[in-house]
Every structure is written in structure tokens, then in C-alpha cells.
């Protein structure tokens, strides 16, 4: 493998995981904060808020997993070779 392609693939894999985790990380923090605030305002709706929060966190985490899949493809099944 060309060393330049290998180095670029490693850098791209790191950027893929790093950049793919920024948005979901901010979104998860905001969603959790709003859920805690909603439960504090209306404690009787805790179960409904928690269920909605967990579902939305799972969807947000999927974006990070997609970045990980791209990084693994760049590292182990490099299409540029």
C-alpha cells in the first residue's frame, strides 16, 4: 500500500469518528438537559419523558456509529488501494 494513502486513510478515519461524534454529543447533552428540566416541572410525566428521551438518544447515537463504520471501512477495507 502506498504510504501516502495509508496516512491519509488513518487521518480520515480519525476525522470521521471525531466529527461524527460532535453533533450527536451536543444533541444528547441538550436532550438530556431538557428532559431533566421537563421532569422537574412535571414529575408525573417522568415515564413518558424518559421513554421519549431514550428513543431519541438511540437515534442520535446511530449517527456516531455510522462514523465508526466509515472509519473501520477506511482502515480495514480501504477502497482507495
Curated annotation (Swiss-Prot):
GO terms under cellular component: chloroplast thylakoid membrane; proton-transporting ATP synthase complex; proton-transporting two-sector ATPase complex, proton-transporting domain
Which UniProt keywords are listed?
A: ATP synthesis, CF(0), Chloroplast, Formylation, Hydrogen ion transport, Ion transport, Lipid-binding, Membrane, Plastid, Thylakoid, Transmembrane, Transmembrane helix, Transport
State where the protein is found: Plastid, Chloroplast thylakoid membrane
Q: Some GO term, biological process aspect, for this entry: which one?
A: proton motive force-driven ATP synthesis
Q: Which domain of life is it from?
A: Eukaryota
Protein's membrane topology: Multi-pass membrane protein
Site Reversibly protonated during proton transport — annotated at 61
Q: Which InterPro entries match?
A: ATP_synth_csu_bac/chlpt (IPR005953), ATP_synth_F0_csu (IPR000454), ATP_synth_F0_csu_DDCD_BS (IPR020537), ATP_synth_F0_csu_sf (IPR038662), ATPase_proteolipid_c-like_dom (IPR002379), F/V-ATP_Csub_sf (IPR035921)
Q: Where are the transmembrane segments?
A: 3-23, 57-77
**What GO MF terms are annotated?**
lipid binding; proton-transporting ATP synthase activity, rotational mechanism
Instruction: List residues, modification N-formylmethionine.
Output: 1
What's this protein's family per the entry? Belongs to the ATPase C chain family.
Q: What else is known?
A: In plastids the F-type ATPase is also known as CF(1)CF(0).
User: Could you tell me which PANTHER family the record lists for this protein?
Assistant: ATP SYNTHASE LIPID-BINDING PROTEIN, MITOCHONDRIAL (PTHR10031), ATPASE PROTEIN 9 (PTHR10031:SF0)
Functional note: F(1)F(0) ATP synthase produces ATP from ADP in the presence of a proton or sodium gradient. F-type ATPases consist of two structural domains, F(1) containing the extramembraneous catalytic core and F(0) containing the membrane proton channel, linked together by a central stalk and a peripheral stalk. During catalysis, ATP synthesis in the catalytic domain of F(1) is coupled via a rotary mechanism of the central stalk subunits to proton translocation. Key component of the F(0) channel; it plays a direct role in translocation across the membrane. A homomeric c-ring of 14 subunits forms the central stalk rotor element with the F(1) delta and epsilon subunits.
The record's section on HAMAP family has: ATP_synth_c_bact (MF_01396)
| Subunit (UniProt) | F-type ATPases have 2 components, F(1) - the catalytic core - and F(0) - the membrane proton channel. F(1) has five subunits: alpha(3), beta(3), gamma(1), delta(1), epsilon(1). F(0) has four main subunits: a(1), b(1), b'(1) and c(14). The alpha and beta chains form an alternating ring which encloses part of the gamma chain. F(1) is attached to F(0) by a central stalk formed by the gamma and epsilon chains, while a peripheral stalk is formed by the delta, b and b' chains.
Protein's recorded name: ATP synthase subunit c, chloroplastic
State the organism's lineage.
Eukaryota, Viridiplantae, Streptophyta, Embryophyta, Tracheophyta
Amino acid at each position: 500500500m502506498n504510504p501516502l494513502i495509508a496516512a491519509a486513510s488513518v487521518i480520515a478515519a480519525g476525522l470521521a469518528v471525531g466529527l461524527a461524534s460532535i453533533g450527536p454529543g451536543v444533541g444528547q447533552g441538550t436532550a438530556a438537559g431538557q428532559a431533566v428540566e421537563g421532569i422537574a416541572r412535571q414529575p408525573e410525566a417522568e415515564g413518558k419523558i424518559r421513554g421519549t428521551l431514550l428513543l431519541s438518544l438511540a437515534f442520535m447515537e446511530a449517527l456516531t456509529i455510522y462514523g465508526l463504520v466509515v472509519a473501520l471501512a477506511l482502515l480495514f477495507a480501504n477502497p482507495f488501494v
